[in-house]
Amino acid sequence: MAEKVIYRGTGRRKTSVAQVILTPGKGNIIVNGVPALEFFPYPTLVQDLEQPLVATGTEKDFDITVTVKGGGFTGQAGATRLGIARALLVASEDYRKGLRAVGLLTRDARIKERKKYGLRGARRAPQYSKR
């Protein structure tokens, strides 16, 4: 029996973690068991997901299955995008130059800053009264 070819990639953004599986197919994107256009409330987020495929010209070459946890929709879309880009690298190192040029291989390190004691938020201080 012939083995199924699969490529895996993991992406993170804010508090979201996405595990991506690429299999040769027709370009279907399934997120947590639901088509991507139904899972994400905004079509722009789905376009965001497709950026690595567009950059490498592989929109119709792979079926993508994603399991994503944590965070909100934007973080989940960002994590999925990075996961897809990393899975494409596993498929072929030739894609690296194109993905790097568009900035799709860089993990966005911006996360929420912690609240400090004595302050109302991460940086917001209580109102100061001179007298």
Curated annotation (Swiss-Prot):
Gene3D superfamilies: 3.30.230.10. One of its GO terms (cellular component) is cytosolic small ribosomal subunit. The keyword Ribonucleoprotein applies. GO terms for molecular function: RNA binding; structural constituent of ribosome. Keywords: Ribonucleoprotein, Ribosomal protein. It holds the Pfam family Ribosomal_S9. Belongs to the universal ribosomal protein uS9 family. This is Small ribosomal subunit protein uS9. The gene is rpsI.
